[in-house]
């Protein structure tokens, strides 16, 4: 029996239309109530002059799911009403009349299980160059628990890492070997030994030290692991150094990782620029080989820093936790790199929470249940020194790696003295905190007292004092004034 003519007329009109507005094609539904199984995304959009914000939001939903520029009859061969993403809410951005927050819901069946590459191809693959929108930024996402459970997450996590290192109750300490380029393998190993012997837990390759003419990767691995073993024997502590296995092909990265494992390394490192498939592959390798995976967020500033266009680092942090890294650089707030204190704390929450609660002051727009995924150890690195120890512990607590590169290797008395200065400052601050003192306000006094019996710390404070890089952050909260760390 044929359907009534009125029922047939509606789809016929739709498919005869050629080009329709996205909101008329079903990509806007202001009455939609997101389901627990929906994947949610929040975009900051800047529509072109004269473009309706609701239409712009519907366009984002359409172009990140099933739409193209014209109506296609093959929609009728799919469950198109289910597969269409739905923009369901548009809010003006506070104090910015040109921008709007656009909330979009995606049915879970649009995404492949356990694949960040597939997720990103949909969510950010096409919409950011769409002409009706001047600029777009992916601010936050919420993943349903069913989707989270398709990822293995970090292979080690914070608790297991502390158990392997036998180090509890304080932040971990590290340093990036400097200069990042130009050292021979032997001299590189000497720097690693001095830093670990002086009291650091980790040393680290920088993002662009791979295998250059001045130092082949195999030489670096050999000299570094010799230094790690000697420092461990001298101090009685478990030590490590992040060996960067980033290379031009996955096959070469696996080869370097296997060599690091054969030398007894407990940790390897990769750069963010290797891509999501590579990150997940290396995470799987680390899980199979009981290795810690450290990720340096090289290149992230090209798309995370600008507030009007790109992808917020809180989203990158969520993807990285799903992808399975054990460490990730998340900012310092007080160092040389971009970072508003409240916004950076939001990144740390994403790494360390079992359940992340909505917190607009820290840029967290959604609740996120991380199910059984292990926690990621955040890393604070870039322009920090012993004189900021009280600020760092106040901001980030214990579960963090504090990496003092220049703040160790630039010490006037040498590398080992620089490491000792940082270790003494850390121990003094943790002790004072555990005794109930207000370390944020009393921090300088606590450091000066500790420096009375520690020459390296005294020299560090004399050299760097209370130096901070006080520039106005670019990526700040829209719902709170920029916070001071002092």
Swiss-Prot record:
Enzyme Commission code: 4.1.1.39
Cofactor-binding details, from the entry: Binds 1 Mg(2+) ion per subunit.
Catalytic activity of the protein: 2 (2R)-3-phosphoglycerate + 2 H(+) = D-ribulose 1,5-bisphosphate + CO2 + H2O; D-ribulose 1,5-bisphosphate + O2 = 2-phosphoglycolate + (2R)-3-phosphoglycerate + 2 H(+)
Keyword check for Glycosyltransferase: no
Single GO MF annotation: monooxygenase activity
Active site as annotated: 178, 296
Extra information: The basic functional RuBisCO is composed of a large chain homodimer in a 'head-to-tail' conformation. In form I RuBisCO this homodimer is arranged in a barrel-like tetramer with the small subunits forming a tetrameric 'cap' on each end of the 'barrel'.
Subunit structure, interactors included: Heterohexadecamer of 8 large chains and 8 small chains.
Protein name (record): Ribulose bisphosphate carboxylase large chain, plasmid
The gene coding this protein: cbbL2
